[in-house]
A protein has these predicted regions:
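Terminal alpha-helical segments
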Residues: 1-110
Length: 110
C-alpha cells in the first residue's frame, strides 16, 4: 500500500486506495473472527462495523473513515475514475487509524 503511494515515477494512487480498503477490511474481519462473530462474504466496511459494534462499541467513531474507504473496494479498481495523491494519502491515514483501533483491541502493538 505505501509502496504504491510513494512510487516516484508513476505513483499508483488507485492501488494505494484499494489496498487501504482491503487492509481495513481484513483487520475488521480479524476482530470479528477473534470474537466468534459470524459474518457473510462481504467487502462492505459499514456492514462489518455494525457487527463489530457488538463487542467494540467505541468503534462507532470510525464510521467516517470506513465510509471514506468503503468506496475503494471497487471505485478505482476498474478503468474510469482515478484517485488523486490527496485521496490516496487520506485513504492510507484512515487505514492506519482503523489498524490502530483493531490492533489495540487484539492486544497487539499499535
Amino acid at each position: 500500500m505505501l509502496k504504491s503511494y510513494r512510487a516516484r515515477k508513476k505513483p499508483a494512487y488507485n492501488a494505494a486506495c484499494f489496498h487501504a480498503q482491503q487492509c481495513a477490511e481484513k483487520y475488521l474481519k480479524a476482530r470479528l473472527v477473534e470474537a466468534g462473530i459470524v459474518f457473510t462474504k462481504t467487502h462492505d466496511l459499514i456492514n462489518l462495523l455494525s457487527l463489530a459494534l457488538q463487542v467494540e462499541s467505541t468503534w462507532a467513531s470510525l464510521q467516517p473513515e470506513l465510509d471514506a474507504l468503503n468506496k475503494y473496494a471497487v471505485e478505482y479498481r476498474y478503468p474510469g475514475r482515478s484517485a488523486t495523491k490527496a485521496g490516496a494519502k487520506d485513504a492510507v491515514a484512515d487505514c492506519r487509524k482503523i489498524r490502530g483501533f483493531v490492533r489495540a483491541a487484539l492486544g497487539l502493538p499499535v
